[in-house]
Amino acid sequence: MLVTAGAVGIPGVLIGPLESEFGWSNAEISAAFAVRLLLFGMMGPFAAAFMNRFGLRPVILLSQTLIGAGIFGALWMTELWQLTLLMGVVVGLGTGLTAMVLGATVATRWFVNRRGLVIGLLTASTATGQLVFLPVMAALTEAVGWRAALSVSLVALFVAAIAALMLMRNRPSDLGLAPYGEMAVVPAPPQQSLLAMLASPIVTLRDAAGTRMFWLLFGTFFICGMSTNGLIQTHFIPLCGDFGLAAVTAAGVLAVIGLFDFAGTVGSGWLSDRFDNRWLLFWYYGLRGLSLIWLPFSDFSLY
């Protein structure tokens, strides 16, 4: 999850160099990366079904392979459609296979007690990936070019894939263990047929779409994703460049955001075990909205 989060944060570092080298506009590059975000979200329900049908390890390995293939191909791209295909479609499919649902799936299968805290810790890996990778990627891009920076991310993906192959297990019952908080080993549920597996996300979405709560959550998470992935992660570094801040400095600011994101995500997991989640979301979205309203009126200085 940490390495996948690093791959998700790459576009913010690449927009400036791609504009300079190929002459593509910010809007054209952003449209290609928007395809990645669209697939990142749409793959979530199907990723959960794939994990239930094939297991965690095969899905993780497929995810890392797709991300690696997209980044590797991008090293030789020369046309805008290649950026859309490789960094949009291929990387979007790869990141979508794990980033949205892997943490929740692992927490649900392995933990009964402290499940909210565990989900918070695993979700915080997104912030950690941002904290670790963005400053490194920005520094490498400035020093030796964006292709060398992408090559480093390929090495990280390879290491993560090897770790998943060696260490990842599907369920506690694979090791004869009970989930944390349970006394008895919980057997794996019977497998669905391939057709039922592919249909289950669509059926679930159809049923959920008839409820008011689904659309309320859909709307809030849509705005959340638009302001986080769409606005901050993708456009914050180029925006800071327009105001005279270097890319490495802007990536450092994002790393600070990632640091507080980590603390907030872990704390949110702890709070969700104790308080009404509706009130938690009220404060989270309210504070985020106030910060975004204030941002255009700041002087964009480092401090």
Question: Residue spans of the language-model regions?
Answer:
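Extracytoplasmic
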Residues: 1-26, 43-47, 134, 229-237
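Extracytoplasmic gate region of multi-pass secondary transporters
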Residues: 11-16, 206-270
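Helix-to-loop junctions at the C-terminal end of transmembrane segments
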Residues: 43-56, 264-276
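C-terminal ends and interior cores of transmembrane alpha-helices
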Residues: 65-78, 287-299
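Cytoplasmic helix-loop-helix junction between adjacent transmembrane helices
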Residues: 87-124
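Helix-loop-helix hairpin linking two adjacent transmembrane segments in secondary transporters
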Residues: 122-175
